Every structure is written in C-alpha cells, then in structure tokens.
Amino acid sequence: RCGVFAKTDIQPMLNQGIAIEDVAISSCHAVAQQTIGGLAQGMEIKPPVIFEGGPLTFNPTLVRVFKERLGISEEQTIVPERSEVLVAWGAALSLGSMFNDKPCDYREEGSLEALRHFNEKRQAEHRENGNPFFKDANEREEFLKRHPMAPAFYPQPTSGSELNVYLGIDAGSTTTKLVLMSEDEQILDGFYASNDGEPLAVLKRALVELADRYEEFGCKLNILGVGTTGYGEQLIAKAVHADYHTVETVAHANAAQHLCPDVSFILDIGGQDMKAISVQDGIVTGIILNEACSSGCGSFIETYARSLGIPMEKIAELAFNAKNPSKLGSRCTVFMNSSIITEQRDGKQPEDIIAGICRSIIENVFTKVIRIRNLDTLGKKVVVQGGTFKNNAVLRAFEQHTGLTPIRPERPGEMGAIGIALLTKRFMEGKRAENPDYKTSFIGLDAARNFSWDNKPGQICQYCTNHCSRTIVTFSDGTSYVTGNRCERGEVTADPNDPETKKLVAEINRKMLAVPDMIK
C-alpha cells in the first residue's frame, strides 16, 4: 500500500498495544511484498540476487525477509560491501569506459566556484516562489500578539494544600496528552509527549511524574474522575479503569465550545488525522474527517523536519524567515516527497521547503478534506486546534489562505484532553447527584508506580469458526484488553473449560442471535 496509508494503519496498532516487534517485521514483509509484486509483475526472479541501496545495506532483517519471500538461499544472495554507494561507484567506473572518448570540462577551482552560485541560478530558472508569511517585522509582531501561547510550565500549587481535580487523557495518534482540571474548570497542570510507539509506557511516565511533582510540592491530589479519548481511548480506559471515555471528535467539539460558546467551525489537525466540525446554535451539524489517508497532517512536517535535524520548536521560526517559500500545492504526501526532492535539486533552502509544507497542509485541508469553495460557510467564529496548530507557521498559512482571523486556544495540542476532562466532570457530577457516595474507579497515582502490562500476540480465539488472531494485553491488576477480535466472544480470555466461562460465552451467543439478520 501507499506508505502514508500504511503509517495510518500502524499508529492505531501501536496505540492498541500491539508489540513494536510485530509491527516492525510486518512492515518489512509489506515492503518486500510490494517491491516484488510491483517490479516482477508475475515474472520469476531467478538467483543469484544482488541487494543494494541504503535500506538493504543498513537493515539486514529486510534482506532476510526478501530471501524468505523469494525462496533463495544464502549462497544465492549477494550483499556487496558498501552497497549503499554502489551506484556512485559505478558512475566513477564508467568514466574509464563509457566516457573515455569525451573531453573532461571539470576544473577544480572554476567548477567549485560555479557550484557556489548554482543554487541561486537554478532557483531563478526553474521554480515559482510563494509570498513570504509577513510583509515586515511589524506585521509579524502583530500576529504573535494576536495569538499568544500559554507558558510551558504550570503554576506551582501551595504547599500543604489539597486539590480536587479531574484527569483527562488524550491518547492521540502520535502524542499523549494529560490535563488536570479543577472543579471550577481551570487547567491546573498537564503533560504532553510523543508516544514513541509505546503509549502505555508514556502514560505510566506521565502519571508517575504527576505523582512525584505534587508529592514534592507537598500538595495532595484528590482525583474525582478520569476520562480517556483518542486513538488509544479503549486501551487506556481499560489500563487505568477510567470512569468515562468517548471518541475524540466529541471531546474536541466540547473543548472548543467551552472556549468559544458561539463557535461556528472547528478545525482540528493532529498527527495522523484532521477533523472539521460545523456548529450552529451550539449544536454540531456536520463532521468531516480525512477519509483514510493522513497526507498533509502534522506527522508529515515532523518527519521531514526530523530528517533535516530541525527541532519541532524551530519549524515556525525557520518558515517565517523563508525568503522564497516553495509552492508544493496540496498533492499526496508521497508525490509531495518527489516535489521536495525537486525543490532541493533546484536550490531551495530548508526554510523555503518547510514554509511550503506548512502552507500545503492548509491547502490540503480545503482542497482534499473539507472541499469548501465558499469560505463564508465557515462562519464568523472559527476555532483551530490540535498539535499541528502549535506551529505558528501553519496558523499563519490558515490566515493567509482564508482571510480569517481564527481563535487558537493557548494550549491547542491539549484540547482533546481538556474536552474529555470536561465531559468526565459532567458525568461524575451526574453520578454523584444520583448517589452521593459514588467514587471514581481510577487505579490511583500510587498504583501507577507499580503499573505493568504483558503483551501476548497471536492468541487464537476458540469460540467460533473465525479463529481470530488476538493480541491480549494483561495488566498488573489482572484485567486485560483484547484487540484483533471480530466479535464480543473474542474478549473472553478465561479458561474455556470453566463453567463460568461457558455461561458467559452462551450469553454472548444469545445476544448475537437476538440481533435481526437484515440480509435474509
């Protein structure tokens, strides 16, 4: 499949607790399968086979997978030394054979001098440039004043105090966010970090850091309720025994309406997805998501910046300093990679390309996702949020593309966590109104210190003919989370011979048979 689609598949798998090792080897098999199918197109690949190029040089597992799929032995495999530069070596060798009858125009000093001015000349000849983000320093200063960001650190609580709070957890596609919300709906503390493919490990670190920090402050935390949302909503809810959980669209809409009660349009751009939510008179009237492809989302610009060694916090500053921003349009990410390579070849500087990518994200939203031609339909109060809008260059690109001045929260990346904290607060207040003794089911911050889990992939379900291959994540308190099952029976992990288990499966079967068959 397309690499962007594959990445969109991988993120939920990691957030559901599937082992990184399983995802990694599956990725190698996917690359080998696509390469063999695309290049051979049904023709037999006969040994010996030579493997060259960077990925096959530095990833011996990928070579092993290719050998398995091609059915060739070690003796039929050739992996040259320094195979990543084999083509360049061939180019050097060709000078003595293919081009030995042609004059050599290379002159060390003159050629190097020409190379110094090559970028400017090539850039002027080949590419159309976009406009800078600002006309002058004053316009830039006004923009920054218009859209302030909250400080990175939260205020320290009073020593000896006691806080009643609600904990909101947004286990997103690429990042994990936590917020502590007071009873009067003020954000007291938070956590924001990359998942790194280990959402449970990051969650444990976040909870332990919170516990340590408030212990150091001499402040007691009374957590009145916990809610989860995001890609890892179900997994995290099971892990921490959350009181409430819901889909991220609902959480984001609630957070935006809390910030701006008369909001007319909400745009959330995360690491792997986009959400466009239309609101009229406080009621959600339409929701549009990017269908399957994550092209143009936050992880694309992050991946490109990382490849250039650019820290995330420096992206906007670099983009704002671009003198000749690239025009990359709203193409598919895979094709855009080709455009970026062309831009680099034509002499564009990293800041010009970064600026072009920031603009392409917004173009992609309006041309490929929400497909709005008349911008008046967005209404007068537009809220933009999500981790991608922490990037001022993306926010400025939105302003320039739409001609609107949107409302960006001071903490745009934490809006999902804020939304679920608000919803959890309302849920728990409703429960306590019915029963004043109602308590949270949260495991507690102290239990988080000893929190552990065990992944067991490839667990075959025996309760029907589907024989689903499940991954069972078992937590330290004995509870478990199951993924890979196609029906409720797959969630049963107890001994199949136990009478109670048989009774449970029979009840599930009864409920499933009670559902009308609409096909017959």
Give the label of every model feature segment.
Residues R1-E21, A32, A319-D352:
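A mobile "lid/hinge" subdomain adjacent to the ATP/sugar-phosphate binding pocket shared
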Residues C2, Y154-L188, V263-I283, I460-C464, ...:
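Gly/Thr-rich phosphate-binding beta-strand-loop-beta motif of the actin/hexokinase/Hsp70
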